[in-house]
């Protein structure tokens, strides 16, 4: 044996892997290895001592013990060790050998490259007939059979990467599932698979013939992805899943809408004929066909599952966090704490998956408690191109899925032309997600039959590839040939399937000519919500109720060690409420939340540091000073109250805002808020604002009551901590699509938050929220301003009792600058200062009436802190001047504020103070 050890290089050959794995096993559970190995490993101080000459004798002794146990095994103990090493190395590296490319363009590695030849493990061809027994194997093989089994399992049409999975139970389960080979298909199932392929390809070809050149972003070449999604849904249904939400980009979407989600073919075809996707009377912009979502119920026997496909823009992968948020909201509604009743399927393209940062943001947040949805089943449709860019131009790794390993996700790569392999991989992935509640990826390597779209010419840039594609059999044809060869179908079966489906589509086409598009919205939970406001929402709450709630919010458990500074703060709040004294911003916000919670409204607030608040004002989560326990006063108001969920988010804007927007889509009765650490950082999520929040209603008939809190205000903190880019939100504002506000009083924020739930419409609310004003002595409101029969006031008149006829100058402003103007004005009674608490929609009637009140004034000024090319000026100029005309005043508003600037603010506090003083003096006419 010792001689054999020297021959095979035991210590430094394939057995090294085996010994290292055995050592890991020993570290986890010493009793799980033989006593002799226990003695050896107990003498090892670190893994570097495992494989050196001084330990050889001890290893040989342990090996001899193993040999005595398996003396009847025809293969020596040394080789038995090497069998383990070979199996492990196949598991780790054989995916590089797998035949994944249906076009045959990829040059794969060889066994010699990967050191997977039998010679690398001390075997020779003479031993191929020798019988092998090993703990990894469920049955006995000879060496040749074992090699064939490993080749078929790990180097065939499926290549797997499971080694990054950190949990050993999960990893072993995955390998066992793959190696068991139990997933097979009956003749009837094979026929159903073929039928699916016929319908996928048939619909694409039908559209291609009827509407030549029309964009549809065909799935052809990646046909298996549609069949795989259907398989995943059917498997999930039998696992007790009640709902599946699907997110995807545009490629293959029309087939997903029809074949997977169940939208009638005639509805999709009608969109090609008329160009209309919604009823004309809705008067909305709509969107292209391959961006639209849909929902339906699929019934199989006595089981039913609800399916929904999320709407999305052309911004690839942007939908990822939105659909995840929607899934989480649905799980929360069902109290699905195990995350097993509502499931997520996400379809990616290869270039976008590794190219778009939101993918990494979404993946990294998926295991976190506030964003976990029990795992996502990811399908990466790798058609080996990104528009015209080759794979080598879009990533440095072989696989587009490489960086997904940051969350230790198992990955199965599969050849898209081998439909049964695709379905086997899907089966494993679906089971894994449901069993372990974690993400899993199936990458389908396929191709794109046409160019990026059907009007694009791919031969310009990928001539070699497309010459292969042109002469290639489709996945349906390939599978039909296999079934004919195996005797499952005869030569006519495939042709009949195609004829039957073509006849069905012809009927659908005729019905599509007179098809009236339907608007599937404002049903179910959304009943009672309307697109237009019918009345002003009364948002006030009885004063005694507010005092009672406020007092309750200031009470702490006796055994809970609150920070002494917070004890003082809460005592002061309680005293103010009890004495009916004015309250500050944080108190008003907490009262808004408390009054909604006790009325049955669930509230969810996330964002960086939002539990405490960036500016240490909210303190809605109290931390015990002795241990790590927490106490949330808002969840301790009454036994019947709704839930307040608050979570400090990971350091992301794009994905976190997207998640909360998605959460808000599921239930209009929830108040959902996202707070930026500083408003300046919100533009990291600009795509969410542009493509979803501002435009989803007119594009897709999707409403949202999401609240976005953006700390804003020029306070000398530099260009990155001053501006939430108010001007950008005002530029996006149109068609009554959202509220853009810059409130200045606690009463305003109280009413704004409550209006989001009490009103009969759901519009996103953008709030330029305060920073220094959170502790400003004048930023307070009386409880009466929050009391019964009160409401949000979009415009606030001059607070002092000035004689209107004596007013010579009227200053309109919004936000923090008001308090600076107010203080500098002092006792000057000839200047009236009016605040716009809501900039959009512009409350023209209210402004006109106030201007009429001050019609004796000779000067009308719009004052802002922001540079002239920022802030509200360029949006509001025409509104203000039109209001002057309606008020019968022949004048125009003059701008006073900072000059135009490429940067939002100066970097110096001294320079800021000079600028601020200058604009205030100019506005007030102070020398």
Swiss-Prot record:
<dbReference type="InterPro" id="IPR005475">
    <property type="entry name" value="Transketolase-like_Pyr-bd"/>
</dbReference>
<dbReference type="GO" id="GO:0004591">
    <property type="term" value="F:oxoglutarate dehydrogenase (succinyl-transferring) activity"/>
</dbReference>
<dbReference type="GO" id="GO:0005829">
    <property type="term" value="C:cytosol"/>
</dbReference>
<dbReference type="Pfam" id="PF16078">
    <property type="entry name" value="2-oxogl_dehyd_N"/>
</dbReference>
<dbReference type="GO" id="GO:0006099">
    <property type="term" value="P:tricarboxylic acid cycle"/>
</dbReference>
<keyword id="KW-0786">Thiamine pyrophosphate</keyword>
<dbReference type="InterPro" id="IPR032106">
    <property type="entry name" value="2-oxogl_dehyd_N"/>
</dbReference>
<keyword id="KW-0324">Glycolysis</keyword>
<comment type="subunit">
    <text>Homodimer. Part of the 2-oxoglutarate dehydrogenase (OGDH) complex composed of E1 (2-oxoglutarate dehydrogenase), E2 (dihydrolipoamide succinyltransferase) and E3 (dihydrolipoamide dehydrogenase); the complex contains multiple copies of the three enzymatic components (E1, E2 and E3).</text>
</comment>
<dbReference type="InterPro" id="IPR031717">
    <property type="entry name" value="ODO-1/KGD_C"/>
</dbReference>
<dbReference type="Pfam" id="PF00676">
    <property type="entry name" value="E1_dh"/>
</dbReference>
<dbReference type="InterPro" id="IPR029061">
    <property type="entry name" value="THDP-binding"/>
</dbReference>
<comment type="function">
    <text>E1 component of the 2-oxoglutarate dehydrogenase (OGDH) complex which catalyzes the decarboxylation of 2-oxoglutarate, the first step in the conversion of 2-oxoglutarate to succinyl-CoA and CO(2).</text>
</comment>
<protein>
    <recommendedName>
        <fullName>2-oxoglutarate dehydrogenase E1 component</fullName>
        <ecNumber>1.2.4.2</ecNumber>
    </recommendedName>
</protein>
<dbReference type="InterPro" id="IPR011603">
    <property type="entry name" value="2oxoglutarate_DH_E1"/>
</dbReference>
<dbReference type="Pfam" id="PF16870">
    <property type="entry name" value="OxoGdeHyase_C"/>
</dbReference>
<dbReference type="InterPro" id="IPR042179">
    <property type="entry name" value="KGD_C_sf"/>
</dbReference>
<dbReference type="Pfam" id="PF02779">
    <property type="entry name" value="Transket_pyr"/>
</dbReference>
<dbReference type="InterPro" id="IPR001017">
    <property type="entry name" value="DH_E1"/>
</dbReference>
<dbReference type="GO" id="GO:0045252">
    <property type="term" value="C:oxoglutarate dehydrogenase complex"/>
</dbReference>
<keyword id="KW-0560">Oxidoreductase</keyword>
<dbReference type="GO" id="GO:0006096">
    <property type="term" value="P:glycolytic process"/>
</dbReference>
<comment type="similarity">
    <text>Belongs to the alpha-ketoglutarate dehydrogenase family.</text>
</comment>
<dbReference type="GO" id="GO:0030976">
    <property type="term" value="F:thiamine pyrophosphate binding"/>
</dbReference>
């Amino acid at each position: 044996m010792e001689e054999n050890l020297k021959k095979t290089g035991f210590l430094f050959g394939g057995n090294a892997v085996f010994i290292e794995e055995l050592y890991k096993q020993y570290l986890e559970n010493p009793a799980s290895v033989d006593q002799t190995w226990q003695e050896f490993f107990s003498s090892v101080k670190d893994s570097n001592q495992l494989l050196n000459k001084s330990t050889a004798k001890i290893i040989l002794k342990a090996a001899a013990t193993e040999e005595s146990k398996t003396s009847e095994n025809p293969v020596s103990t040394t080789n038995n060790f090497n069998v383990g090493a070979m199996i492990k190395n196949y598991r780790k590296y054989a995916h590089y050998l797998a035949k994944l490319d249906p076009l045959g363009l990829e040059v794969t590695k060889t066994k010699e490259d990967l050191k997977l030849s039998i010679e690398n493990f001390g075997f020779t061809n003479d031993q191929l007939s020798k019988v092998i027994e090993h703990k990894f194997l469920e049955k006995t093989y000879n060496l040749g059979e074992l090699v064939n089994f490993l080749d078929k399992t790990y180097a065939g049409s499926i290549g797997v990467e499971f080694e990054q999975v950190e949990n050993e139970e999960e990893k072993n389960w995955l390998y066992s599932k793959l190696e068991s080979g139990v997933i097979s298909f009956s003749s009837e199932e094979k026929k159903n698979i073929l039928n699916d392929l016929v319908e996928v390809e048939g619909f694409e070809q039908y559209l291609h013939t009827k509407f030549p050149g029309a964009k549809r972003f065909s799935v052809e070449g990646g046909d298996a992805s549609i069949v795989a999604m259907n398989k995943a849904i059917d498997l999930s249904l039998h696992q007790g899943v009640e709902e599946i939400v699907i997110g995807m980009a545009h490629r293959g979407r029309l087939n997903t809408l029809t074949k997977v989600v169940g939208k009638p073919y005639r509805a999709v075809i009608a969109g090609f004929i008329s160009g209309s996707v919604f009823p004309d009377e809705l008067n909305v912009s709509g969107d292209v066909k391959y961006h639209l979502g849909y929902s339906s119920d699929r019934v199989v026997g006595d089981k039913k599952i609800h399916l929904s496909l999320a709407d999305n823009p052309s911004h690839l992968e942007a939908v990822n966090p939105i659909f995840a948020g929607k899934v989480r909201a649905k799980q929360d509604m069902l109290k699905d704490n195990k995350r097993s009743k509502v499931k997520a399927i996400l379809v990616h393209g290869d270039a976008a998956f590794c190219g778009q940062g939101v993918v990494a943001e979404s993946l990294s947040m998926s295991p976190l408690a506030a964003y976990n949805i029990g795992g996502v089943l990811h399908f990466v449709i790798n058609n080996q191109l990104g528009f015209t860019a080759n794979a080598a131009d879009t990533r440095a790794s072989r696989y587009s899925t490489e960086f997904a390993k940051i969350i230790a996700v198992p990955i199965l790569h599969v050849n898209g032309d081998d439909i049964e392999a695709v379905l086997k991989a899907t089966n494993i992935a679906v089971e894994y997600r449901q069993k372990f509640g974690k993400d899993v990826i199936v990458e389908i390597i396929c191709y794109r039959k046409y160019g990026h779209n059907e009007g694009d010419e791919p031969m310009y840039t990928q001539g070699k590839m497309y010459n292969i594609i042109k002469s290639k059999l489709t996945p349906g044809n390939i599978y039909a040939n296999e079934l004919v060869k195996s005797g499952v179908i005869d030569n006519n079966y495939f042709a009949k399937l195609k004829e039957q489906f073509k006849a069905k589509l012809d009927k659908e086409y005729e019905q599509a000519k007179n098809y009236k598009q339907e608007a599937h919205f404002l049903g179910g939970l959304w009943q009672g919500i309307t697109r237009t406001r019918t009345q002003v929402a009364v948002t006030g709450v009885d004063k005694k109720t507010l005092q009672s709630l406020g007092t309750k919010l200031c009470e702490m458990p006796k055994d809970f060690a609150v920070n002494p500074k917070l004890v003082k703060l809460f005592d002061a709040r309680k005293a103010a409420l009890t004495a009916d004294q004015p309250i500050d911003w944080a108190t008003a916000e907490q009262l808004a939340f408390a009054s909604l919670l006790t009325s049955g409204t669930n509230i969810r607030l996330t964002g960086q540091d939002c539990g405490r608040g960036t500016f240490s004002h909210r303190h809605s989560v109290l931390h015990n000073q002795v241990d790590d326990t927490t106490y949330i006063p808002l969840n301790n108001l009454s036994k019947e109250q709704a839930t307040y969920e608050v979570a400090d988010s990971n350091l992301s804007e794009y994905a976190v805002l997207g998640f909360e927007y998605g959460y808000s889509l599921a239930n209009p009765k929830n108040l959902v808020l996202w707070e930026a650490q500083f408003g300046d950082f919100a533009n990291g999520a600009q795509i969410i604002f542009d493509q979803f929040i501002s435009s989803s209603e007119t594009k897709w008939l999707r409403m949202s009551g999401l609240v976005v809190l953006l700390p804003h205000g020029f306070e000398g903190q530099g260009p990155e901590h001053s501006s939430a880019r108010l001007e950008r939100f005002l530029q996006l504002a149109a068609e009554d699509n959202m509220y853009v506000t810059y409130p200045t009083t606690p009463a305003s924020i109280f009413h704004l938050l409550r209006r989001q739930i009490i009103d009969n419409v759901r519009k996103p609310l953008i709030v330029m929220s305060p920073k220094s004003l959170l502790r400003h002595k004048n930023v307070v409101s009386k409880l009466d301003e929050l009391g019964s029969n009160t409401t949000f006031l979009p415009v606030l008149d001059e607070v002092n009792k000035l004689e209107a006829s004596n007013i010579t100058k009227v200053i309109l402003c919004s936000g923090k600058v008001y308090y600076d103007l107010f203080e500098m004005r002092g006792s000057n009674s000839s200047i009236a200062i009016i605040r716009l608490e809501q900039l959009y929609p512009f409350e023209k009637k209210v402004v006109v009436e106030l201007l009429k009140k001050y019609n004796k004034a000779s000067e009308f000024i719009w004052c802002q802190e922001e540079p002239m090319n920022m802030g509200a000026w360029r949006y509001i100029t025409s509104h203000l001047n039109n209001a002057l005309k309606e008020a019968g005043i022949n004048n125009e508003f003059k701008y006073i504020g900072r000059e135009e600037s490429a940067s939002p603010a100066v970097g110096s506090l001294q320079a800021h103070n000079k600028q601020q003083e200058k604009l205030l003096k100019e506005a007030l006419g102070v020398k």
